[in-house]
């Protein structure tokens, strides 16, 4: 993957426009989870250290496009950055007709979704963004799968368009896991629906030596083996698809499960064989024997790609399966890459972040990359690198 990297450029005195992913949860004007800002900080600090005139922007939430809405302002992000940086930081609300930035200063440009035409990759808006800078840095892997004015359009018109350190690291890590993985390669795909992950399952079935399924997805595979899944979340119309995948790839289907009669945090868990699930029960986690089987597979892996929990880990009674799998990944000597919101929440819950080789910041972008789809922002950077 050939792109210009920000780390290869001399940014001194240059106007640098960084498109970061600062889309963080905010409550009462305060950032409640700073993971994405922390991930973006090294890029911002590097540009400032080089003496660049630094602008950074992002989307935040889903405001009505083209309208300012205080609820979706980047002000809480600015206040967070002021605490973390020794450099001056200020928020600029109206910037499309130009903005003055001093060397060593950080200017945060207000939420890009307040600009009409952002989501449609409007050419006029893209050119206005490009006119603000000498160097455009795309560093938001989480939005690289969307062709929008601040992630894609600007890069076509800026003097220089490059990949920031965070984006470059994402592409390197995913490339390492998917293009030439050390084997055996094990992929874990959890989540509630086969339909939303079908292309991912299909792509990984061709790459992985073993494909582990979890959550509602696993229930569809359990049904495909002829077992009754009771009231469990599963997709009857995709049972044949699950049967097909079972013939093309090595997929260990759970042999025992934890069930409950209601979907509730306080519902007691009953451990039983998949042969014994009753009509009024729902499967909410894999059982101990199944979890240990997966742990053994993961122990011998050389590459692990993890997307999604294997049970409803948010409920303490149905956490054990995901915890065993998570700890097996953490203890493995394999190159491990994890992505997706629920996966990151599980990593935080079990405190294993420092034991995962690479944690992806992208949700949809992570999945689309795994599917083998072209990410518009990355394609644009590759195109610009040729010129």
From Swiss-Prot:
One of its GO terms (molecular function) is ATP binding. Pathway: Carbohydrate degradation; glycolysis; pyruvate from D-glyceraldehyde 3-phosphate: step 2/5. Its main location: cytoplasm. It comes from the Bacteria. The modification N6-acetyllysine is found at residue 84. Substrate binds at residues 21-23, 36, 59-62, 113, 146. It holds the Pfam family PGK. GO terms for biological process: gluconeogenesis; glycolytic process. The keyword Kinase applies. ATP binds at residues 197, 314, 340-343. It is found in: Cytoplasm. This is Phosphoglycerate kinase. It comes from Escherichia coli O157:H7.
């Amino acid at each position: 993957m050939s792109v210009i990297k920000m780390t290869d450029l001399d940014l001194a005195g240059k106007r640098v426009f960084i498109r970061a992913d600062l889309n963080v949860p905010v409550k009462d004007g305060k950032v409640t989870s700073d993971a994405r800002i922390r991930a973006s900080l090294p890029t911002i600090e590097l540009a400032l250290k080089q003496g660049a005139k630094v602008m950074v922007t992002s989307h935040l939430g889903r405001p009505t496009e083209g309208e300012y809405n205080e609820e979706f302002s980047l002000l809480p992000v600015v206040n967070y950055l002021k605490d973390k940086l020794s450099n001056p930081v200020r928020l600029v609300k109206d910037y499309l007709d130009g903005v003055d930035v001093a060397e060593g200063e950080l200017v945060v440009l207000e939420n890009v979704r307040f600009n009409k035409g952002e989501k449609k990759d409007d050419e006029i808006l893209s050119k206005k963004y490009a006119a603000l800078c000498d160097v455009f840095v795309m560093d938001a892997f989480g939005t690289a799968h969307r062709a929008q004015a601040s992630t894609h359009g600007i890069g076509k018109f800026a003097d220089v368009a490059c990949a920031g350190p965070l984006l470059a690291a994402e592409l390197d890590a995913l490339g390492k896991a998917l293009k030439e993985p050390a084997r055996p390669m094990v992929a874990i795909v959890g989540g509630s629906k086969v339909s939303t992950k079908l292309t991912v399952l299909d792509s990984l079935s061709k790459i992985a030596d073993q494909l582990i399924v979890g959550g509602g997805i696993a229930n569809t595979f359990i049904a495909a083996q002829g077992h009754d899944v009771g009231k469990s979340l599963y997709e009857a119309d995709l049972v044949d698809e699950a049967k097909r995948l079972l013939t093309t790839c090595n997929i260990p289907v759970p042999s025992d499960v934890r069930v409950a009669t209601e979907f509730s945090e306080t519902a007691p868990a009953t451990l039983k064989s998949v042969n014994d699930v009753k009509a009024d029960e729902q499967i909410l986690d894999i059982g101990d024997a199944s979890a240990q089987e997966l742990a053994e597979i993961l122990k011998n892996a050389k590459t692990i790609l993890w997307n999604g929990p294997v049970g409803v880990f948010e409920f303490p009674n149905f956490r054990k399966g995901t915890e065993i799998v998570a700890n097996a990944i953490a203890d493995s000597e394999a190159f491990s890459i994890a992505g997706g919101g629920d996966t990151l929440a599980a990593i935080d819950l079990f405190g294993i972040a420092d034991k995962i080789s690479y944690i992806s910041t992208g949700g949809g972008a992570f999945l689309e990359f795994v599917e083998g789809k072209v990410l518009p922002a990355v394609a644009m950077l590759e195109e610009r690198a040729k010129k």
